Curated annotation (Swiss-Prot):
SMART domains: IL6. It is found in: Secreted. This is Interleukin-6. GO terms for biological process: acute-phase response; glucose homeostasis; hepatocyte proliferation; interleukin-6-mediated signaling pathway; liver regeneration; positive regulation of multicellular organismal process; positive regulation of receptor signaling pathway via JAK-STAT; positive regulation of receptor signaling pathway via STAT. The gene is IL6. The keyword DNA repair does not apply. The keyword Disulfide bond applies.
Amino acid sequence: RFTSAFSLGLLLVTATAFPTPGPLGEDFKDDTTSDRLYLTSPDKTEALIKYILGKISAMRKEMCEKYDKCENSKEALAENNLNLPKMAEKDGCFQSGFNQETCLMRITTGLLEYQIYLDYLQNEYEGDKEAIEAVQISSKALAQILRQKVKNPDEVTTPDPTTNASLMNNLQSQNDDWMKNTKIILILRSLENFLQFSLRAIRIK
């Protein structure tokens, strides 16, 4: 199947790119091997985003069926200050006022900011663990790919460890089953929206 073959190819590509599961540091900045250029064409980048979206969709469906967490948690978004990365007009990713460089920077930075939330999901998601691992590996690979397209890649900022620690503490607070599952579905939905904006943005010429 295409997804299995794509997943295998993705793992081969990211094995060199991300030798450890830790935060992206110097390894993220200076490696430009030919293997890692495998997915840099627009159609391959789109395929990677769609692959991640497919995994997220499957996880959301699983949450819906297993915990009745479908589309009934919107009110909880206002009650939980999760500080999830979002697209804004100033990010240059909307068709009106589109700016490719600014947009690529925002997508790349946003994907890195999502890693702490995916760490939380790795610990708390009780469904298909391979799916959440695939989402995290793939989103790191996508950040690496898009960073190579930025004119000034050194300006891409990685999240501050202190901020990440504070975010994780916030995520782990009030972690009864209902709150935990609500946070999981909100993170998945927010990342899905972010990637859908990203997909539309990279298609704008």
